Design a protein with these regions (language model features):
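Short, contiguous, pocket-lining structural segments
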Residues: 7, 21, 135, 139, ...
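N-terminal low-complexity or simple alpha-helical regulatory segments
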Residues: 1-124
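Extended mid-to-C-terminal alpha-helical interaction segments
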Residues: 170-171, 175-246
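Short hinge/gating elements
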Residues: 81-86, 129-133, 213-215
Length: 246
């Protein structure tokens, strides 16, 4: 059986909110991607990733929004529901980077985030991104805003990485975006990455009145597994998936 990548619907909502602000036909674009407007009702619901990516591509191309991913990513890191709640439970930035990588797998089943460490440097990275070129660009741009926002929890909201490596080769409306005003952006890389200063790693995050994160990983794993089975069962015809995988 082919693996069907799945993603939380909250990310479709982030791009859909941009369309709403512009007065663009969000519902029609969702339908063209094979999605119902109802997917936005439950941000923690999971949907086939290829449909989510298709919606993002249609939105960017139809509306001519070259920086759609950056606009969609213009949210507080606290705005991503359960992902945010659990990320903010850890005491310092070093643990936040590791938690981000773990929690991302409960947001997107093929998420590939990692922290690359040496004696002198620490890099926050995202491996190769799925989808067509336009899809990959705007998924990556939202992803990198979330990554930078995580470091800003400890470094302050004005912090920017000196160098940002992006996978996309399309620089339109990216280099001149305020998020990168003090960053050198390099395009066409194998991974998305930037260096996190060593002195920031032990910095404490703002305290939150929330329970401990450690006990929640097993429950998230169970919930995501159940949801995957439900989606897959609904997409099979005679035991064969009706969709393709990336």
């Amino acid at each position: 059986m082919q693996i069907i990548p799945l993603v939380r619907s909250k990310y479709v909502y982030a791009y859909g909110a941009v369309l709403d602000r512009l007065g663009a036909p969000r519902r029609q674009l969702l339908q063209r991607a094979g999605l119902s407007d109802r997917v936005l009702a439950d941000p923690e619901a999971i949907i086939p990733a290829h449909q989510a990516w298709g919606f993002i591509r249609l939105a960017a191309q139809t509306e001519g929004i070259d920086d759609l991913g950056l606009v969609a990513g213009d949210l507080s890191i606290e705005a991503y529901g359960e992902f945010s709640q659990r990320l903010l439970q850890v005491p310092n930035l070093n643990q936040a980077l590791e938690a981000f990588c773990q929690l991302a797998l409960h947001e997107y089943s093929r998420a590939d985030f990692f922290v690359s460490r040496s004696e002198r440097s620490t890099w926050f990275c995202r491996g190769p991104i799925d989808g067509e070129e336009t899809e990959k660009k705007h998924v990556e741009l939202l992803v990198v805003t979330m990554m930078i926002a995580t470091v800003q929890l400890a470094a302050g909201s004005d912090w920017q990485p000196p160098i940002v490596l992006l996978q996309t080769k399309d620089s339109a409306r990216v280099e001149d975006h305020p998020l990168f005003s003090r960053s050198a952006v390099r395009f066409g890389n194998r991974v998305t990455a930037f260096e996190v200063p060593q002195h920031l790693l032990p910095q404490q995050l703002p305290s939150r009145l929330v329970p401990s994160a450690r006990s929640d990983y097993d429950r998230l794993e169970h919930e995501f597994s159940v949801a995957i089975r439900q989606v897959v069962e609904g997409m099979l015809v005679g035991g064969v998936p009706k969709t393709v995988s990336y």
